[in-house]
């Protein structure tokens, strides 16, 4: 499958059938690679955002773990906080985030089954924000790839500023 590392491609059909991902969007490099076909990506980063001020932002890791175990053995589980958990299943890293911010997604992209992708502009905004905290070559490459699609850098920066509440 274009955009996915081979071991991720092997399980993507099963992942697409999981009920636990319905409220999440696939974000990050993998979501971008599936849309732009710029590089192979292997991690599956799922994120959901606040929809109301009073919403409690938590990841139901026990429900997710139970469903992920239908794909393969849970090789690892790391609970970082009530809003962030990671698993390794069949050699693939899964991340689940419940973000306290409102969604930057303007156009939902249905990929397959229950997998929906954040749109390119939203991914760019999130990449720009994360680059303030870390410096990975792949993030710079992803921003370059986004700009190559014709998205205006000023529009992308404005979207990133709105997302980061600046």
Question: PLM ranges: what are they?
Answer:
Residues 1-166:
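Compositionally biased terminal segments of proteins
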């Amino acid at each position: 499958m274009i955009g996915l590392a081979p071991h991720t491609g092997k399980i993507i059909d099963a992942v697409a059938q999981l009920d636990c991902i319905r409220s999440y969007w696939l974000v990050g490099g993998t979501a971008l690679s599936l849309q732009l076909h710029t590089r192979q990506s292997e991690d599956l980063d799922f994120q959901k955002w606040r929809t109301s001020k009073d919403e409690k932002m938590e990841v139901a890791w026990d429900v997710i773990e139970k469903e992920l175990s239908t794909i393969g053995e849970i090789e690892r589980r790391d609970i970082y906080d009530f809003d962030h958990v990671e698993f390794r299943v069949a050699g693939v890293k899964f991340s689940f985030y419940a973000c306290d911010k409102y969604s930057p997604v303007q156009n939902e992209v249905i990929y397959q089954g229950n997998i929906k992708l954040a749109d390119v502009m939203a991914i760019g905004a999130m990449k720009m924000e994360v680059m303030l905290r870390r410096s990975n070559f792949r993030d710079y490459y992803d921003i370059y790839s986004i700009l190559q699609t014709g998205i205006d850098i000023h529009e992308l920066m404005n979207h990133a500023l709105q997302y980061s509440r600046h």
